[in-house]
């Protein structure tokens, strides 16, 4: 793995703080600079000390690969629609933020003065730092160690979704989360309809405020809205 540009800027105090964070994460970094970058918000990045945005980008893909492969192998009797629905909940912003908070990552996250820091970090930032830590572990120790970290922290979300799937209303869950954390009510927009009348497939996106999220597909508008949620 390539060394990060942080090597000469970490102080003894920085290293002590990172080692404490490692205990929360349950992983010892060979290169603690990767963890330092994962914990740095763009509001305080410098040329020498980059933010975690690139790691977050990588972590999102690593997380998606690991969870997709796990669900594919674990639930061999489930179709693509079921697997997609399970995955959408397990790797949702709410789930990642929950795990980030449980691990105490917000206490180690470096943010600038302009970033709102209420009692806890905003949910989106908590989820982002979880993804960045996933990428840092992947860069430091490879895919298998990243896989262990992901499944150790998210496996119970898989069980929760499966055990309660027949009772879950994804639109209701999204609405509760959006109203509580973002003070907005989700809306849904049909972006495409395909197929003959007896085999229609609808593609719907969820909209929260001004942000449009990934689409969901279903055989009815309601099913597509549930998938999008």
Regions found by a protein language model. Give the residues of each.
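Double-stranded RNA-binding/processing signature
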Residues: 1-229
């Amino acid at each position: 793995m390539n060394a990060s540009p942080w090597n000469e800027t970490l102080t003894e105090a920085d290293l002590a703080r990172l080692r404490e964070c490692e205990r929360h994460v349950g992983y010892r970094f060979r290169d603690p600079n990767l963890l330092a970058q994962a914990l740095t918000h763009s509001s305080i990045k410098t040329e020498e000390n980059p933010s975690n945005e690139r790691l977050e980008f990588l972590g999102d893909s690593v997380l998606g690969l690991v969870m997709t492969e796990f669900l594919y192998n674990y639930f061999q009797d489930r179709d693509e629609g079921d697997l997609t629905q399970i995955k959408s909940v397990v790797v949702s912003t709410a789930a990642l933020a929950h795990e980030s908070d449980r691990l105490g990552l917000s206490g180690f996250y470096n943010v600038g003065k302009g970033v709102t820091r209420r009692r806890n970090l905003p949910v989106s930032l908590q989820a982002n730092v979880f993804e960045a830590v996933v990428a840092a572990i992947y860069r430091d120790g490879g895919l298998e160690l990243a896989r262990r970290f992901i499944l150790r922290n998210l496996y119970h979300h898989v069980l929760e979704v499966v055990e309660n799937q027949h009772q879950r209303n994804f639109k209701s869950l999204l609405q509760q989360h959006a109203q509580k954390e973002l003070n907005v009510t989700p809306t849904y927009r049909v972006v495409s309809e395909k197929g003959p009348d007896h085999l229609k497939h609808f593609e719907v996106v969820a909209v929260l405020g001004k942000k449009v999220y990934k689409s969901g597909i279903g055989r009815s508008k309601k099913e597509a809205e549930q998938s999008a949620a």
